[in-house]
């Protein structure tokens, strides 16, 4: 009975959230992290207009956001925000949720709440297909390599696990890392596998090094999963958890 009452209360809070004028679910994302989220100039079947112009957002995160908004009975609004500004934007009320390929790390949990994960991946290093590291199968193979990662992400911090690495300055976003690799300024950058595959589609001269068991990065489960970020104490948390848990594996693959 107690669990039932708690569930009813949570539902009432969410309904109250909508009735109080929050008819739109404002979602913050970078719109620059394919295949999770990106910006395009033309509308598409599943693309969503970005607030205040600037094109349309699409990608895996956008499809998750569409499902969440639909099942909450709310309109979806995408708020394009630089990666570093996402937590602050959420806490300041600029948007209601972060759906941006963000991992629920312990550090982030100090300031915002996270839902259950909606995606899980692994870490690879994106390299030139014809470069000296294309056949690498272990971190040790990258000794002396110039490697970077995105600023303020755990992708950058794990570079320290590479023996003898020539760690480069962190770059602001994946576009900057792609340009740096293509121009030869770096030998590789750390990415999750989906991001690496997306980069290869746009840049056929790219490849990526995946690692044999025990030869790759040591990571925590929270580092390689992706979840929705919410304000501390958000009434949306339980309901969004239910929605995410209701998305079948088949639906996730099709997205």
Cite the ranges covered by each PLM segment.
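Bacterial N-terminal signal peptides
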Residues: 7-16
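Short amphipathic alpha-helical coupling segments at ligand-binding clamshell hinges
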Residues: 64, 138-141, 192, 231-246
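Hydrophobic residues within well-ordered alpha-helices
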Residues: 68, 90-91, 125, 142, ...
């Amino acid at each position: 009975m107690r669990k039932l009452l708690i569930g009813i209360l949570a539902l009432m809070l969410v309904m109250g959230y909508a009735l109080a004028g929050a008819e739109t679910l404002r979602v913050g994302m970078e719109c620059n992290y394919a295949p999770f989220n990106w910006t395009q100039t033309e509308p598409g079947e599943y693309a969503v207009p970005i607030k205040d112009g600037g094109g349309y957002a699409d990608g895996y995160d956008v499809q998750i956001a569409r499902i969440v908004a639909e099942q909450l009975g709310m309109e979806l609004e995408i708020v394009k925000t630089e990666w570093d500004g996402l937590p602050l934007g959420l806490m300041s009320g600029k948007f209601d949720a972060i759906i941006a390929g963000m991992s629920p790390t312990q550090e982030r949990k100090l300031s915002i709440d996270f839902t259950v994960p909606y995606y899980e991946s692994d870490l690879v290093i994106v390299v030139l297909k014809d470069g000296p590291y294309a056949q690498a199968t272990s971190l040790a193979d990258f000794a002396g390599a110039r490697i970077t990662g995105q600023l303020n992400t755990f992708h950058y911090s794990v570079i320290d696990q590479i023996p003898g690495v020539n760690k480069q300055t962190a770059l602001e976003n994946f576009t900057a890392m792609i340009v740096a690799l293509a121009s030869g300024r770096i030998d590789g950058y750390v990415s999750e596998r989906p991001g690496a595959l997306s980069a290869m589609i746009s840049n056929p001269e790219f490849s990526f090094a995946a690692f044999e068991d025990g030869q790759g990065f040591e990571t925590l489960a929270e580092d390689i999963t992706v979840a929705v970020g919410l304000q501390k104490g958000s009434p949306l948390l339980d309901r969004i958890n239910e929605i995410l848990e209701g998305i079948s594996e088949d639906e996730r693959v099709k997205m």
